[in-house]
Amino acid sequence: TKAVIIADGGFEGIFNGTGIGFGMDLALQSGIPLRDMEFISKTPFGVTNSKLTLSSNMLGYGANLCDTSGNTITAENFVQLCDVTAQSSGAVIDGRDMGDDKVWWQSAFRTVKSSTGVDMNKYTVGLENRVNQTLGGIATDECGRAVIGSWSRWFTGLYAAGDAACSGLNGAGALPGNRLLDALSGGSSSGNHASEWVKDQSFSNTDNLLASLE
């Protein structure tokens, strides 16, 4: 192998049973330290009694976030929204009055109905706060290279991207939409650098490989 790009998910599965961070574990067992593991991102749009998470963009298309009494829940930013919903007696999302924009969300509606039995065209859906993204991981530089030591020495041949990487793009808290941006930019940087770097490199452990074939 000339180069390896670790580009799997984070470890939010510790909290919600989805991604469990195999790539990070592989790096850690290879002696590569992980960075900023204390930083996580929460969402108030986790569908209760399921592993589903709805997009906050639904609010911009006419859906309403309410408490169990029907009062609209508002906040100045996403972090505050998480705090407000956590302090309320319960939260629901109402997608019944989204008008013509509802057609764009029918896939999400069908997924919710398949998982919970609730038809969002007719009923509200209960929500809960949950961890949906972890921000720590394999420290990378601007080229997507895994860095160690004082975060300045490359672990030669290793790259990371996506939720497995800690690029610094998100800081201590991710904004909605930046997860995709981080994955795209990290994947592009690591892929481009790796493809150029391997042109002048030899395969590692070639002698051992050839010896095993004799």
Q: Where are the predicted features?
A:
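Long, amphipathic alpha-helical stalk/connector segments used for oligomerization, subunit docking
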Residues: W197-E214
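Secondary-structure transition/capping motifs at alpha-helix termini
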Residues: L28-R35, R145-V147, S152-W154, E196-S202
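Mobile, glycine/GP-rich and aromatic-enriched active-site lid/loop segments adjacent to catalytic centers
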Residues: T1, E38-A174
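Glycine-rich loop(s) and the adjacent beta-strand/alpha-helix scaffold that form part
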Residues: A3-L52, P176-H193
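Short, intrinsically disordered, charge-balanced linker/junction segments flanking boundaries
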Residues: T1-I5, G9-F15, S69-E76, A211-E214
